[in-house]
Amino acid sequence: MIKMNTMMKIILDEGEQQECTIQVDDVLKKIVDKTKIIKNCIVYDEDGALEEEKINFDRIIHFVGDKTGYEVSCNELRFSRQKIHPCQFPVLARKLSDMLFQKYNPQKIVVYISLYDDEFELRFHTYREDEKLWLDEDLNKYDKPILCWI
C-alpha cells in the first residue's frame, strides 16, 4: 500500500507529464546486496564492516528507542534527484520492499522516500506489530514531500 502527503502527490502528478524510463533495478540491487541482519534488524552496511558482536545494541536502543529506530537510522541513503526522477519513487519503494522481503522473508518492509531540494532520502525498516511506524500515519504533518510504501 502506498501513502503520501499532498506535497508528494503534487510532485508525482507533475512527473506524470514526463517520460519516466530510468531503471531503478541496478540501484536497488546494490542497496539490497549491502544489507545484513544485525540483532534481528535489516541494516544497510555500505562497507561490509559491521560486526554484530562489536555493537552495543542496548546503548543504541537507549538512544533510538526501538528496533525500528535503529533500522531507520542505519538505513538512510541519499541520492541526487537527477539520478532517479520522482516519477520513479513509487516503483523504487515497491521494488525495494519486494527485494528485501525476498531476501529476508517473511519480514514485511516499510520504505520512505522524502525530498530535500536536489536530493531525495530513502529509508526503510522492518514492519513490527509491536512497534509503531517510524513516521506518523498522517504524512501531511511533515513539511517535506514524503511517500511511504507499506
Provide a role label for each language-model segment.
Residues M1-S73, L77-R81:
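N-terminal leader/targeting segments
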Residues C87-P90, R94-I150:
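Acidic, proline/glycine-rich low-complexity IDRs
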